[in-house]
């Protein structure tokens, strides 16, 4: 497997420092790194969630539709290659809206702290889930979860709902889920995204994030 190199970012603006490292070393060193999240809003409205693979970050949890590290020299929409790699889909650039940036610090399954500068985008898609071709190593399954279920789950941690989707073999899957089944991101990230997705589905495109 080819080694991926990333830019080390520095505060206060979290711009590239000029230091480039292999991504694993940068994670181990506790450096701030740039990542992209693309959220795909579905009819309903609903959000497309991917199931995280074993190992690494939030294994087995619901996570953003698409995500990945910016490689050295990349910024903005450069990271959209992840959409095709993970979902087998070429997302039209003109359909994507920048939501904003936030900082995130989390602990992965190897007990490493990940210091992330997350650039968040959103788009809308209403074609069948079966159109996506999942990379089984990165995305075991995808789920289409109604925004209302996401909101209720995070406003009431005891609330359970059924999530439906397709696995990497395009076979139907379902699971009974609650807030604990989502990746943990400080600051109510999933709840905020759900509220934004509701507005996005109604046509709003300007957000204070």
Task: For each feature predicted by the language model, list its residue ranges.
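Acidic, metal-coordinating catalytic segment for phosphate/diphosphate chemistry
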Residues: 2-37, 41-43
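Short loop segments at secondary-structure junctions
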Residues: 12, 42-45, 53, 124-128, ...
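Short acidic (Asp/Glu) patches
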Residues: 18-26, 63-64, 79-84
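A generic structural micro-feature
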Residues: 30-32, 60, 111-115
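A glycine-rich, hydrophobic loop/mini-helix early in the fold
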Residues: 35-69
């Amino acid at each position: 497997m080819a080694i991926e190199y990333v830019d080390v970012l520095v505060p206060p603006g979290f711009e590239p420092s000029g230091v480039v490292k292999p991504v694993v070393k940068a994670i181990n060193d506790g450096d701030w790194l740039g990542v992209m999240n693309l959220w795909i809003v579905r009819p309903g409205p609903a959000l497309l969630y991917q199931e995280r693979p074993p190992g690494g970050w939030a294994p087995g949890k619901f996570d953003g539709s698409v995500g990945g590290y910016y490689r050295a020299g990349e910024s903005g929409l450069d990271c959209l290659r992840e959409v095709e790699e993970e979902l087998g889909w070429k997302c039209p650039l003109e359909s994507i809206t920048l939501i904003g940036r936030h900082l995130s610090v989390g602990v992965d399954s190897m007990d490493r702290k990940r210091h992330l500068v997350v650039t968040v985008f959103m788009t809308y898609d209403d074609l069948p889930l079966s159109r996506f071709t999942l990379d089984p190593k990165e995305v075991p399954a995808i789920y289409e979860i109604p925004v209302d279920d996401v909101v209720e789950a995070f406003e009431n941690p005891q609330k359970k709902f059924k999530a439906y989707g397709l696995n990497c073999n395009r076979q139907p899957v379902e699971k009974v889920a609650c807030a604990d089944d989502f990746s943990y991101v400080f600051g109510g990230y999933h709840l905020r995204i759900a509220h934004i997705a509701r507005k996005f589905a109604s046509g709003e495109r300007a957000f204070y994030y």
